[in-house]
C-alpha cells in the first residue's frame, strides 16, 4: 500500500469525516475493504430539487493524495460507469456550475478539483478556503460538494 | 453498560471531537473527557449544550437522562448566550445558544430581512464582509473566543466561474 492510500485510510477514521457521516452528509460506498485504489466512491447528500434521489455518488481519483488535489466524477454504482449526464445534479447557485458536463464530463468544476484548478489560478484568491492545499484532506472536497448541493438558505419545495 | 459515540465542539475548534462515553456518565464526566483531550481551557465555568438547544445541561445529570443519544453533537462554552448581530441592508440582533448552527442563524436572518426563494438560496454568512463563507454546520460558539457577541454579514454566494 502506497503512502497516498495509507494516509487516505487514516483520514477515513478522522473525526471530521466521521462527524459528517454521523450527520448524514456523506458516506463511503461499501466498506473500506472494497476500495479499489485510487478510486474510492462516496455518496453525498443533496437537496432533492437538485438530485431527486437525495444524493449523488462520486468516484474519486486520489492518486498522489494529498500532495495532488483529488478529482471526482458523478458515478452510477449499479452499472459502475459514469453517471449519465442527464442525471447529474442541476440547479441554481453553484449546482449546475460545479456539475457542468458541458465543461468536462469526468470532473467537477470546483476549486478543489485538480482538473478544474488548471488555468483557474484566480480561484486561489476568490475561493481561497476551497483551493486545494496539500494540508487538506478529502473531507474538504466532500464539504465543498455538500455545501453546493445543500445551500443553508434552501427550502425544499412543498415544505 | 452501553457506550455511545458523541461529537463535542468548543471554542476555536474547527471540527468536532469524537468521544465515547457510557450512558451512565454525567455531563461533568463529558466535560472532563473533553478536557482530557485538550479541547477545553481549564478553569472557569463551562456550559454544555446539545446542538441547536437553548438550555445548557446540568453537570450532574447522566447523559442517558438528558436526551444525549448515539452520534449526538454537543457544544462546550463559557457563554450562556451569544448576542448575534447580522448586517445586510440594516442590522438585526438576537441571542442564540453557543450550540446553534450557522444554518439556523442564517434561516433566522433570511426571515428577518424578508428574503426567500432564489434571494435566500444564494446567501451566506461571513464574519467579515469579504471573508470566507461560514460552514452551515458550524456552531456559532466556535466563532467567539472571549466575548459573548458575534457580528456577521449576510452576503451573496460567490459563484464558481471564470
Question: Which residues fall in each region the model found?
Answer:
Chain B
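Ubiquitin system architectures
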Residues: 1-162
Amino acid at each position: 500500500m502506497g503512502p497516498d492510500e495509507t494516509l487516505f485510510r487514516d483520514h477515513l477514521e478522522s473525526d471530521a469525516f466521521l462527524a459528517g457521516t454521523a450527520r448524514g452528509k456523506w458516506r463511503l460506498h461499501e466498506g473500506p475493504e472494497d476500495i479499489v485504489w485510487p478510486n474510492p466512491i462516496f455518496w453525498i447528500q443533496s437537496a432533492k430539487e437538485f438530485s431527486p434521489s437525495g444524493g449523488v455518488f462520486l468516484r474519486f481519483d486520489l492518486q498522489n493524495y494529498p500532495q495532488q488535489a483529488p478529482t471526482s466524477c458523478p458515478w452510477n454504482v449499479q452499472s459502475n460507469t459514469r453517471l449519465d449526464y442527464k442525471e447529474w445534479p442541476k440547479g441554481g447557485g453553484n449546482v449546475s456550475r460545479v456539475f457542468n458536463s458541458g465543461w468536462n464530463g469526468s470532473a467537477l468544476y470546483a476549486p478543489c478539483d485538480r482538473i478544474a484548478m488548471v488555468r483557474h489560478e484566480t480561484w486561489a484568491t476568490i475561493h481561497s478556503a476551497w483551493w486545494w492545499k496539500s494540508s487538506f484532506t478529502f473531507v474538504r472536497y466532500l464539504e465543498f460538494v455538500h455545501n453546493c448541493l445543500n445551500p443553508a438558505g434552501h427550502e425544499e419545495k412543498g415544505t | 453498560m452501553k457506550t455511545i459515540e458523541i461529537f463535542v465542539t468548543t471554542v476555536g475548534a474547527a471540527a468536532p471531537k469524537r468521544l465515547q462515553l457510557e450512558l451512565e456518565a454525567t455531563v461533568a464526566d463529558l466535560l472532563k473527557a473533553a478536557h482530557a483531550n485538550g479541547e477545553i481551557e481549564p478553569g472557569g465555568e463551562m456550559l454544555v449544550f446539545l446542538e441547536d438547544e437553548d438550555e445548557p445541561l446540568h453537570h450532574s445529570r447522566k447523559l442517558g437522562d438528558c436526551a444525549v443519544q448515539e452520534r449526538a453533537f454537543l457544544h462546550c462554552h463559557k457563554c450562556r448566550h451569544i448576542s448575534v448581530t447580522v448586517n445586510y441592508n440594516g442590522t438585526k440582533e438576537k441571542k442564540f445558544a453557543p450550540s446553534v448552527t450557522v444554518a439556523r442563524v442564517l434561516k433566522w436572518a433570511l426571515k428577518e430581512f424578508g428574503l426567500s426563494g432564489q434571494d435566500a438560496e444564494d446567501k451566506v454568512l461571513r464574519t467579515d464582509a469579504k471573508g470566507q463563507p461560514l460552514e452551515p454546520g458550524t456552531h456559532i460558539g466556535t466563532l467567539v473566543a472571549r466575548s459573548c457577541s458575534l457580528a456577521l454579514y449576510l452576503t451573496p454566494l460567490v459563484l464558481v466561474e471564470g
